[in-house]
Amino acid sequence: MMGDKGEKECATASSPIELGCGEGDESGNKSSMRTVETLLRLVPVALCTVSLVVMLKNSQTNDFGSLSYSDLGAFRYLVHANGICAGYSLLSAIFTAMPRPPTMSRAWTFFLLDQVLTYLILAAGAVSTEVVYLAYKGDEAVTWSDACSSFGGFCQKTTASISITFVTVLCYAVLSLISSYKLFSKYDAPICFNGKGIEIAAFHS
């Protein structure tokens, strides 16, 4: 009777209704994950655009002279990096929102591009942070005086733009983790061999 009961439970568990429910749950999870990833890719579009606009409009003229973001290579790099990041974020969000079957080539493409964009925007923020730090503190070793005491408005806008850039870095760090998971989850776990058995077989041969 216990064997009959086990067979009934197996038959019930493998019924078409429950199989259909399992497939529905799986498709629902994929849809919700796709929605979350799409939103995460849209957020950097707004962040990069705001950082870009703030830096583009960042210039100040006073009795000490005039200063613009274009006078410093680090800030020009920040502008270009934010522009590239905004464009890629928008395109990747559109592709992510499209319900397409996952393929290995697509997973590799998103993984590599997300990694490149993460380091690109991180480098832009780091280099700009160093420049604005020198603008605030100066460097006595090379007799550089601080510039922010004379161009306070310029430094404030620069700090705001850099801060927004680092928020973008956090978003792309999360996106890199997601794309890494989606890629490497497609690979099977490595097969573990019994080393002792292999040694014995080699010895007897």
UniProtKB/Swiss-Prot annotation:
Cell compartments where the protein resides: Cell membrane
Gene Ontology cellular component list: plasma membrane
Membrane-related topology note: Multi-pass membrane protein
Membrane topology, Extracellular segments: 57-77, 128-157
Pfam families xrefs: CASP_dom
Major location category of this protein: membrane
Cytoplasmic compartment spans: 1-35, 99-106, 179-205
The keyword Transmembrane helix is assigned to this record: yes
Family note: Belongs to the Casparian strip membrane proteins (CASP) family.
Quaternary structure, from the entry: Homodimer and heterodimers.
NCBIfam families given in the database record: A_tha_TIGR01569 (TIGR01569)
Name the UniProt record assigns to this protein: CASP-like protein 2A1
